[in-house]
Every structure is written in C-alpha cells, then in structure tokens.
C-alpha cells in the first residue's frame, strides 16, 4: 500500500500499435517490478495554445461518458479598455480514463504560471497516471480509504522530488472502486483545482475544494514538500459512494463570483521557535448558479462564459489597467454502469493480450538467430505465424466484445500453442493459465447478460455457440488457407442477428 517504498523506475509509454486510434483509444502502460499495468485513456488535454480553445469529441469506448473543454480566461486590458496581447499557452492538463478493471478516473492539473509546462505534463504521464490502477485496487483491499489516499499523495511528492523537481502544479484526482458489490469514488485535491459531483437525483456536492492558504495555495512544489502531512490536513481527501449516471466534473479554475466559502479555519505552523498562524479557506462551486436538471458540465461552461463576459465589460469601464483570470479547463466523467464496466475490462484485456502477442513475436524473431536462418528448425516461423493470426483477429474484432472474448478463449484453450499461451500468462501477470481462462470466462458470462447478446443468440444455447466458434477459430489458426473465419464471425454482429440465429455456422 505504501507506494513510495515499492515503486522504482516507473516508465510510461503509449501503446504504439494503436496510434491510429489516438483520439479514441489511448493505453497507458507501466512496469512495476515486472508487473505490467494498463489503463484505457478516453480523453486527454495537454493545455491549449494561446488564443485557442479545445472541445473534445465523444468517445465510443465509454459511450460518450467523458468530455473535456479547455480555453483561457486570462484578461489584460489597458486604460482604454483595449486588450494587451501577451502570448501564453495554457498549462492545464486533464486526463480521463478507466483502469484495467473498468474503474473510472479523472486527473485535473494546473501548472504554475510560467512553469515548465512540458515537465508538468510529462510527470503526470510518466509517474502519476501509472499509479491509478494500484490506487483503485488498494482502495478495494484495505478498509481505511483515507490512509490509502494519503499514501498516494506521499508517493507523488516523493516521485516529483526525485524525477521532476521543475514540475510545479496543483492537482485533484479521483478514481472509482468496487467493494461489497457497491461503487465508491475516492481521491484528493491539493491547491486551487476542484471536483464536484452531480448525483442522479440532481444534488451537487463538492468532493475537492479550491483551497487557499493565506490567499495563496499549497501545491506539488518544493515549498509544500517540506511538510506534506500538514498540506494533506488542510486540503481535501474524500471517499463517497457513487451510482452509475453520477457526473464528476473536475476544473482548474472558475471566476471567483461562481464560488462560495464552504469553510474557513486557522492552522498553526512551527518555524523553529516561531509559531505562525495561517488562514485556510475551502471554496466550493455556488450551487445557486446551477439547476438539478441539465448536466453540470454544460451548465458550468455556459455560466462561466456569461460571467466572464460580464467581468470583461465591467473591467473596460474602469479606465484603469486590469489583469485577472486564469487558464480554464474542465472535464466531465459519468460513472459507468456494470455493463459498460465489463466492456471496458474486455477492451483492456484484449489490448493487453494483443500487446503480449507483439512482444512474443519479437521474442521469437530474436530466437531465429542470425539472418533468421534457424526459424524453420526452431519452430519460430510457425509460432510467429500463429501469433500474428491471433493478433490480427483481436485487432479486427476489438469493438465486438463477444467475439473478442471468444478469440481470447480460443487462444487460451489452444492445445497446440502451449509456449505462446504460457508467455502471455507471464506477460499479463496471471499466476496461472487457469486463472487467465477463468478471467475470460467471467467476462464472457457477464457479457452474455447484455440484452443485445440475448437477442443475437436467439434460441441457441450460448455454450454451444461458444464451443462452435472456438473450434473454428482454432482450426483457422492452424490452417488459415482452408477456412473463411471472417464469414462466420461477421454473422455475430448486431446488424446480422437474423443471419446469426438461423445460420448453421458452416465455414
């Protein structure tokens, strides 16, 4: 649970095999002592260029449950009310995604003004994002969510000090987890970013407050690193039960008139023999600006636009130099239901297996020896061919959850490829082949609860269909020229229900 004692030399990469899906499918990967962890990234924004804004598109992977908007609310006017142009690219970053177990998360980051923005962005990618899977798992494993979250905060401070001392930023972070068949969301906020939740029934609650300390802010920086426990104590750590459909909105800044003071208190700090007293304020979104019907995300964008226009008009009338505002980035994440969670888990596993097959192919190519002349004698050529066929099938049907699982199940049960299967078991960090097979079966049984799947299957028994398809996939892998597997698999799509239920599935 104490990450900073066990995590060493974390490395972050995007899965280059899927760069053609870069706007819809980002995979984060990290090696923790040989354990490969993967997350699905559905939305990401690394700031915006001066004078530009960014509105993310919908992502089919999570059924449009995530969005990001980014712009700048910086205003600098001269005495005549004319804009003073000063080029500044924004230093905000938001990442929205799901762990390999389908648990939703959101990371909201605001880099310091004038900071090394790329250092901030890289640190989040390389060192924070890879921690999310274990954070969610530990929240499930251990009873004290507050201690788990505080451990994560210590980890981030430790990693920053060691690997990215030039990265200075404030941050809010949240992740969901399952315990006792219920969904929860836990996380924290250090500094002036915030996270609010709009419940299904319309209630808005603040999970992470915008926190001020004597008018300034704590942060992930050298100054705050000197007393991390005190920083944690006066900022936000939370844990709350959530339901599918609840909306999590993270933001880096809103105009002050949209906030209200939720709490103000005094803390003491000791500097040598001197005792300093500091005033801490927790600021929330003022719920009076929002209704209980429309999404909080869209309401916040509209209210901010209106208030910003009002502020600019007032500033122009003063006849004085005016400077105010900040970068403005906001993210929306809707808690997925169990069906979508299962489908996200399927997708993550499919990508993991595909990546494992790529690694296996690379390994077999190395085993072929100088100029590859020993490939025939070692069997590497045959192994590479079979692994490539499986990999191509997974890539082709990755958006069909049922077929994806059938392919994975066939791969694991293929008695003629024991070395490849064993390689994948180790690559995916499963203790045994049986446990990997059980994982696939568990996901398959849950996918069969999907009403669309029941309609597709019609009167046919699922076990018969699964066994028949597995057999034909394995037959294709070992004799690709003698079968047309795609004609069979293409029957099992939503737009060919009738053909699927009436077909004898003869290749």
From Swiss-Prot:
Listed Pfam families: SidD_C, SidD_cat
GO terms under cellular component: host cell perinuclear region of cytoplasm
Catalytic activity field: [Rab1 protein]-O(4)-(5'-adenylyl)-L-tyrosine + H2O = [Rab1 protein]-L-tyrosine + AMP + H(+)
Keyword line: Host cytoplasm, Hydrolase, Metal-binding, Virulence
Species name: Legionella pneumophila subsp. pneumophila (strain Philadelphia 1 / ATCC 33152 / DSM 7513)
Residues annotated as binding a divalent metal cation: 92, 110, 192, 271, 326
Record localization: Host cytoplasm, Host perinuclear region
Gene of this entry: sidD
Key word Metal-binding present: yes
The protein's name: Adenosine monophosphate-protein hydrolase SidD
Domain of life: Bacteria
Entry's EC annotation: 3.1.4.-
Family matches, as InterPro entries: SidD_C (IPR048702), SidD_cat (IPR048704)
Species classification: Bacteria, Pseudomonadati, Pseudomonadota, Gammaproteobacteria, Legionellales
């Amino acid at each position: 649970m104490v990450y900073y004692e066990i995590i060493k030399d974390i490395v972050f990469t995007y899965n280059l095999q899927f760069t053609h899906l870069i706007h819809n499918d980002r995979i984060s990967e990290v090696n923790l002592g040989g354990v490969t962890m993967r997350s699905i990234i559905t939305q990401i924004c690394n700031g915006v260029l001066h004078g530009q804004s960014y509105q993310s598109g919908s992502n089919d992977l999570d059924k449009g449950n995530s969005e990001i908007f980014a712009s700048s609310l910086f205003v600098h006017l001269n005495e005549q009310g004319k804009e003073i142009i000063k080029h500044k690219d924004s230093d905000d970053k938001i990442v929205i995604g799901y762990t390999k177990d389908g648990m939703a998360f959101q990371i909201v980051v605001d880099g310091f003004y004038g900071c090394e923005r790329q250092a901030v962005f890289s640190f989040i990618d390389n060192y924070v994002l890879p921690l999310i899977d274990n954070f969610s798992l530990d929240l499930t494993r251990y009873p004290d969510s507050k201690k788990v979250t505080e451990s994560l905060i210590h980890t981030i401070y430790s990693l920053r000090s060691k690997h990215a001392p030039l990265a200075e930023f404030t941050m809010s972070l949240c992740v969901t987890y399952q315990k006792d068949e219920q969904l929860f969301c836990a996380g924290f906020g250090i500094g002036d970013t915030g996270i609010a939740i709009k419940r299904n029934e319309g209630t808005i609650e603040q999970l992470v407050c915008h926190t001020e300390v004597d008018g300034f802010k704590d942060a992930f920086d050298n100054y705050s690193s000197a007393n991390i426990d005190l920083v944690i104590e006066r900022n936000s750590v939370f844990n709350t039960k959530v339901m599918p459909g609840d909306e999590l909105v993270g933001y880096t800044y809103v105009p002050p008139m949209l906030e209200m003071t939720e709490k103000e208190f005094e803390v003491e700090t000791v500097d040598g023999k001197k005792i300093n007293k500091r005033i801490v304020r927790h600021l929330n979104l003022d719920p009076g600006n929002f209704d209980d019907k429309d999404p909080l995300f869209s309401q916040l964008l509209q209210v901010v636009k209106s208030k910003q226009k009002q502020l600019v008009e007032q500033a122009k009338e003063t006849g004085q130099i005016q400077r105010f505002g900040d970068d403005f980035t906001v993210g929306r994440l809707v808690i997925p239901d169990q069906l979508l969670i299962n489908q996200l888990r399927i997708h993550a596993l499919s990508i993991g297996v595909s990546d494992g097959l790529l690694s296996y192919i690379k390994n077999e190519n190395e085993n072929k020896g100088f100029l590859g002349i020993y490939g025939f004698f070692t069997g590497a050529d045959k192994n590479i061919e079979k692994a490539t066929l499986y990999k191509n099938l997974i890539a082709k049907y990755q958006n069909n959850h049922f077929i994806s699982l059938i392919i994975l199940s066939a791969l694991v049960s293929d008695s003629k490829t024991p070395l490849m299967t064993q390689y994948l078991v180790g690559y995916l960090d499963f203790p045994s082949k049986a446990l990997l097979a059980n994982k696939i079966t568990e996901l398959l049984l849950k996918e069969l609860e999907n009403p669309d799947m029941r309609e597709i299957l019609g009167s046919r028994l699922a076990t018969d269909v699964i066994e028949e398809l597995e057999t034909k996939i394995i037959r294709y892998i070992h004799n690709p020229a003698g079968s047309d597997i795609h004609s069979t698999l293409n029957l099992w799509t939503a737009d060919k229900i009738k053909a699927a239920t009436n077909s004898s599935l003869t290749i």
